[in-house]
Amino acid sequence: MSRLRPILSLILVFVAIFVVSCGSPKASVPTTYSPEKIEQLQVLVEPITEAREKMSVLQELIADQNWIDIQTYIHGPLGGLRQQMRNLSTSLLPKDQKAAADLGKELFNRFERLDAAAKERSISAAQSQYRQAVQDFDAYLDLIPQAS
């Protein structure tokens, strides 16, 4: 039995090498969006697009210098936007994910600065952050492929 152990070990090594070498190659990452993927992305982008359309409410609150409602709007209706944008960003192709994630982070940095401007009751800072937030929002939405 002691003479068979080295032979058995050698056979197991050969079997392991054979099994590993017969493994399938890695799946390639798609470089374009399929129609099914675009449909899926359109479902994910819908609430984000609705939030973008409602940004005019925030602009009106800033114009009225309604500081408490500005903060409430940022933390209320726009509160779930971060998670929705993160989910959408991770659903994009790898080449677009980083840009989408960076724009999403920048947008929420703008919201945080807008919130701080509302606390300080600074209309000029609030207007500036609002304009930049809208630009970031539009740039983010421009990354999302549209159905043809």
What are these regions (language model features)?
Residues 136-148:
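Short, low-complexity, Pro/Ser/Thr/Gly-rich segments in the mature regions of secreted, periplasmic
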Residues 81-101, 148:
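Short, solvent-exposed, charged loop/turn and helix-capping segments
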Residues 18-21:
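C-terminal motif of bacterial Sec signal peptides marking the signal peptidase cleavage site
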Residues 1-11:
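Bacterial N-terminal signal peptides that target proteins for export
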Residues 43-53, 57, 73-80, 87, ...:
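Charged, amphipathic alpha-helical oligomerization/scaffolding segments
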Residues 23-72:
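Immediate post-signal-peptide N-terminus of mature secreted/exported proteins
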Residues 65-69, 95, 114-128:
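Short helix-adjacent coil turns
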